[in-house]
Amino acid sequence: MSTAKLVKTKPSELLYTRNDVEEHVKVATIKRLNQMVIQFIDLSLITKQAHWNMRGANFVAVHEMLDGFRTALTDHLDTFAERAVQLGGVALGTAQVINDKTPLKSYPTNIHSVQEHLKALAERYAIVANDIRKAITEVEDENSADMFTAASRDLDKFLWFIESNIE
């Protein structure tokens, strides 16, 4: 005969995982991770839009620079999405979710000069860079904070590179 007690627990909105981070920390962290997934997906698509459609002085240098940014953004968003799942959540990365939840302004499709694209990109990179710095201090999960810190370093560098090319 078992001496184990039955303990009633409240239903969880999370998927089962043996990860022992407290549930309330997981829930808040997953929410913030998904906010970053959304912003990084949108920023990566915006970056590619500019990459494809710019013309003018410094085209080759900026075109190639943006390719590197896109690769790094995709790597970071993949890390965020996987961390959300590791904590028992669901990564939210569909076009519908991105369109509905992004804080970024719609990217203009009627601009063509390198300078116009750089200005539009700088505005959007700054929004994400500033928000991820807030996320670093908001999350209680240290691993996620470390991921945000790594991404923040890249975003600050990318914003600096973009702004340094604006005439």
Curated annotation (Swiss-Prot):
Protein name (Swiss-Prot/TrEMBL): DNA protection during starvation protein
Matches recorded under InterPro entries: DPS_DNA-bd, DPS_DNA-bd_CS, Dps_gammaproteobac, Ferritin-like, Ferritin-like_SF, Ferritin_DPS_dom
MF (Gene Ontology): DNA binding; ferric iron binding; oxidoreductase activity, acting on metal ions
Keyword Protease: no
Statement: the UniProt record of this protein carries the keyword DNA-binding: yes
Positions of Fe cation binding: 51, 78, 82
Organism: Yersinia pestis
Gene coding for it: dps
Subunit structure comment from the entry: Homododecamer. The 12 subunits form a hollow sphere into which the mineral iron core of up to 500 Fe(3+) can be deposited.
Gene3D superfamilies: 1.20.1260.10
CDD domains, per the entry: DPS
Family indicated by similarity: Belongs to the Dps family.
Compartment annotation: Cytoplasm
Function of the protein: During stationary phase, binds the chromosome non-specifically, forming a highly ordered and stable dps-DNA co-crystal within which chromosomal DNA is condensed and protected from diverse damages. It protects DNA from oxidative damage by sequestering intracellular Fe(2+) ion and storing it in the form of Fe(3+) oxyhydroxide mineral, which can be released after reduction. One hydrogen peroxide oxidizes two Fe(2+) ions, which prevents hydroxyl radical production by the Fenton reaction.
